[in-house]
């Protein structure tokens, strides 16, 4: 194992309507406050409960915000990015990059309503077999006495 984590990177357009508490998330990053080594991008650090982003459900902590209302966030100071969000208006369009860790090994898709975990029969069958062996050994031992 090389210790490296692989990611599946996807982009998504998310439209939010500013609520009473703003857009409902905090950001980190910028050219003066790099959040990720060698990356001056702007990242979501926290989703506020009951905020616009939480109600929408698509924006996640750790997502990289690429643009706000079509304006690129590359090479911005942190405060300039904050100001851009604050002045974006009520209807805000975000271009977001999600990074999902790639699972090693096969991916198993379960059907809806299908239980997860180990089936009961997989547990009970070995227990039943061991019980039968113990009973057989006990009966055989008693016959020898």
Curated annotation (Swiss-Prot):
| Top-rank taxon, per record | Eukaryota
SUPFAM superfamilies documented for this protein: PDZ domain-like
Q: Which residues lie on this side of the membrane: Cytoplasmic?
A: 1-117
Annotated localization: Mitochondrion outer membrane; Cytoplasm, Perinuclear region
Topology in the lipid bilayer: Single-pass type IV membrane protein
Q: Does the keyword Transmembrane apply?
A: yes
Report the residue ranges that make up the PDZ domain in this protein.
13-100
Enumerate the UniProt keywords alphabetically.
Cytoplasm, Endocytosis, Membrane, Mitochondrion, Mitochondrion outer membrane, Signal-anchor, Transmembrane, Transmembrane helix
Outline the inducing conditions. Answer: Up-regulated between 12 and 24 hours after treatment with activin A and lipopolysaccharide (LPS). Down-regulated by calcium ionophore A23187.
Q: List GO terms (cellular component aspect).
A: cell surface; mitochondrial outer membrane; perinuclear region of cytoplasm
Q: Do you know which PROSITE patterns this protein is assigned to?
A: PDZ
Write out the tissue specificity statement of the associated record: Isoform 1 and isoform 2 are widely expressed, notably in brain, heart, lung, liver, kidney, skeletal muscle, ovary and testis. Isoform 3 is detected only in heart, spleen and testis.
MF terms per GO, please?
Answer: type II activin receptor binding
Question: Where this protein primarily resides, as one coarse class?
Answer: mitochondrion
> So which stretches are on the Mitochondrial intermembrane side?
139-145
Q: Which Pfam families match?
A: PDZ
Keyword Transmembrane in the entry? The reply is yes
Q: Where are the transmembrane segments?
A: 118-138
Which CDD domains does the record match to this protein? Answer: PDZ_SYNJ2BP-like (cd06709)
GO BP, one annotated term? cytoplasm organization
Task: Describe its function.
Answer: Isoform 1 regulates endocytosis of activin type 2 receptor kinases through the Ral/RALBP1-dependent pathway and may be involved in suppression of activin-induced signal transduction. Isoform 2 and isoform 3 show a stimulatory affect on activin-induced signal transduction and enhance activin type 2 expression at the cell surface.
Subunit notes for this chain? Binds (via the PDZ domain) to isoform 2A of SYNJ2 (via the unique motif in the C-terminus). Interacts (via C-terminus) with RALBP1. Interacts (via PDZ domain) with ACVR2A (via C-terminus) and ACVR2B (via C-terminus). Forms a ternary complex with ACVR2A and RALBP1. Interacts with MAPK12. Interacts with DLL1; enhances DLL1 protein stability, and promotes notch signaling in endothelial cells.
**Protein's recorded name:** Synaptojanin-2-binding protein
The record lists the organism as Mus musculus
């Amino acid at each position: 194992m090389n210790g490296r984590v692989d990611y599946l990177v996807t982009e998504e357009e998310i439209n939010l309507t500013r609520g009473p508490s703003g857009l409902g998330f905090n950001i980190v990053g910028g050219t003066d406050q790099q959040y990720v080594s060698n990356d001056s991008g702007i990242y979501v650090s926290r989703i506020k409960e009951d905020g616009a982003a939480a109600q929408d459900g698509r924006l996640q902590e750790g997502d990289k915000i690429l643009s706000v209302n079509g304006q690129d966030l590359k090479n911005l100071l942190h405060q300039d990015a904050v100001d851009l969000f604050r002045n974006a208006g009520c209807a805000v369009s975000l271009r977001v990059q999600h990074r999902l860790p790639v699972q090693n090994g096969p991916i198993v898709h379960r059907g809806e309503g299908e239980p997860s975990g180990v089936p009961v029969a997989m547990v009970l069958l070995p227990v039943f077999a061991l019980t039968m062996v113990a009973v057989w050994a006990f009966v055989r031992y008693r016959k020898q006495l």
